[in-house]
Structure formats: C-alpha cells, structure tokens
A protein has these predicted regions:
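Cofactor-/ligand-binding subdomain signature composed of acidic, glycine-rich
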Residues: 1-22, 281, 307-308
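A short, well-structured juxtamembrane/interface segment
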Residues: 14-30, 158-172
Length: 309
C-alpha cells in the first residue's frame, strides 16, 4: 500500500488545504444546551467543540441511555437540539438522528458528506470540506470542524510544524508518551484512538494531561520510553530524565494547534516504525471492518475528498 501516506503527511496536507479553502463558521452561541453525539473521534471532537459550554456529550454506546435520562429536560424544552457529528454521515449517525427525532429534538448534522444517509434526514446540516485521506485518519474532517469554531490560522500551525526539529534518536525508542496542558485533555483520547488504529498491540503510545500524568502513570520508568511534554510547564518527574523531550508552545494556542501537533508527532512515530497500518488496512476495509456493521460492501481504503480538493 505504497500510496498510503503517514499521519504527519496528512496533517500537512490538511493544513495546506485549509489555508486555501474557506470553512463555514460554527457559531456555538446558537446552541443553549444541546445533546452532542458522535462515534470515535467524532465524540472527542464534540468534547472539544463544547468544552467550557453547557452540553451533554454522548457516543454510540451511551446515546440511548443518555437521551432517556434527560427526557424530562427535553419535555420541558430545556434541551431542544441534538448535534450529530459524523464525517461520513453513515453508520451510527443514521439511527442517532432517527432516535433524536423520536424525542422531538431538532437535529443538526456536522458532516463532510452532503449526500449521505444522515444528511437526507437531518433537520439542518453544516457541511465541511475535506481532503482525500486513508480510512480512519479523519484529519481534515474533524480538524475543519475545530478550526470553524476556534478560528485559528492554519498557516501559523503549518509554519510551526515545518520548523519543528525532531529530537535526536527519536526512532530508537520503543514506546512514547505525550503530556498535554490540562486545558487540552479532550485531545488525549484522540491520540489513544490513533494508537489503536495505527499500531494496535504492536507499540505503546500513551497520552495524558499534566493532571492525569501525576496520578501514577509513570510508576514504571524505562529509558526506551520517550516522554514528550507540550507547553511551558516543565516535566520534572515523568519518565527517565534522559528520555524527555520538552516542546515549547507559542503564547496563544488553541485546540486545532494541539491536535495538529500531536497528530504530527504520532505520524513521526509511524514513519519510523514498521508499516503496521499499511500492511493491515486493506484486509480490514475489505473483510472484517464492514462485516462488523453487517455490511458486505468494502470500505474505501482512501476516502475521497471534496469536489474542490
């Protein structure tokens, strides 16, 4: 699968794309107290978008229970909207919209797929452009949504990444940990998902906020684990001293910056290790991946981008 890029290349491509293509503006103030639902990193994107706001965030495993638990607030019109986040507009997002409608909630779909099954039944849509990417990557899909809310400049992020000097001996480590400023904790599960997608059981990749890192995450130290810390708070305790890398950040950064930086670093790991993802993604997309959803049709190994991509 030589045509499959690594994650870091996908980040650069997405930032270059958004530097040239306009995004819709996501005005979060229009939502007073929504239920936000998404699967995988769509769920984590919901956590990012509504961090610091009144919202209930659920995923495909918790949505049925969540919406029932808040039935009284829905009936009282305190909760009036369900925001469904789905890049593809397929899979779980279809029944999630149908369920929200049964509860008389207004459904707003955030998607990159205007012709999808969910797009046909949602009350409203916000459509995002995207680039072609390997299946599961979803860099441009969710990055576009985050940028539309934070209004960060993709060119500034791109310049930072292109100037970043990778630590000497980076590829010699056999495990990696990322420590993020506490305010960006919502990104840590996104890294964990990328670990599962790209490396499975083959490599250790962990991500914590500073606050979580203090809770016995580094009881066991190993000089072969590189601990990468982002931000001005110095890592004085986590990992072996000779196996730490501190990356200072600009004074003002937001979620899109941290998402791009962490994904870029994961891509650096990916390109320096065996091609676990590239060697397995074809079989996943053509066999057991779609079968888990009860589908016979294969997934696209390269998910097409927008028409203007």
């Amino acid at each position: 699968m030589k045509n499959i890029i690594n994650l870091d290349q996908g980040v650069i491509g997405a930032l270059e794309f958004f530097s040239k293509n306009k995004l819709p503006k996501l005005n979060l103030d229009q939502f007073t107290f929504p239920i936000v639902v998404g699967s995988g990193n769509a769920y984590n994107t919901g956590q990012i978008l509504f961090s610091g706001r009144k919202a209930i965030v659920a995923d495909e495993s918790t949505f049925k229970k969540t919406i029932e638990n808040y039935r009284d607030l829905i009936n009282k019109k305190i909760i009036k909207e369900a925001i469904i986040i789905s890049a593809s507009g397929e899979k779980d997002s279809i029944w999630e919209i149908e369920l929200a409608k049964k509860y008389k909630l207004k459904t707003i779909l955030l998607t990159c797929s205007p012709d999808s099954s969910s797009a046909k039944i949602a009350d409203e849509m916000i459509i995002y452009p995207k680039v072609s990417e390997p299946y599961t990557y979803n860099i441009s899909t969710y990055l576009g949504m985050v940028l539309s809310a934070t209004s960060e400049n993709p060119k500034l992020i791109l310049n930072f990444l292109k100037k970043l000097k990778i630590k000497n001996g980076f590829k010699s480590y056999n495990s990696y940990s990322l420590i993020l400023p506490d305010e960006f904790i919502a990104i840590t599960p996104m890294i964990d998902i990328k670990k599962s997608e790209l490396f499975g059981p083959k490599l250790s990749l962990r991500a914590f906020s500073f606050g979580h890192a203090r809770h016995a995450k580094f009881v066991i130290r190993d000089k072969k684990e590189l601990v990468i810390t982002l931000g001005k708070e110095k890592n004085m305790y986590f990992g072996e001293p000779q196996s730490r890398w501190q990356i200072d950040l600009p004074n003002k950064v937001d979620f899109a910056f941290i998402l791009c930086l962490t994904y870029y670093l994961v891509g650096q790991i990916q390109k320096n290790k065996p091609a676990y993802f590239k060697n397995n993604i074809k079989n996943y997309c053509q066999d057991y991946g779609p079968k888990a959803y009860g589908h016979n049709k294969s997934f696209d190994i390269i998910v097409p981008g927008s028409i203007n991509n």
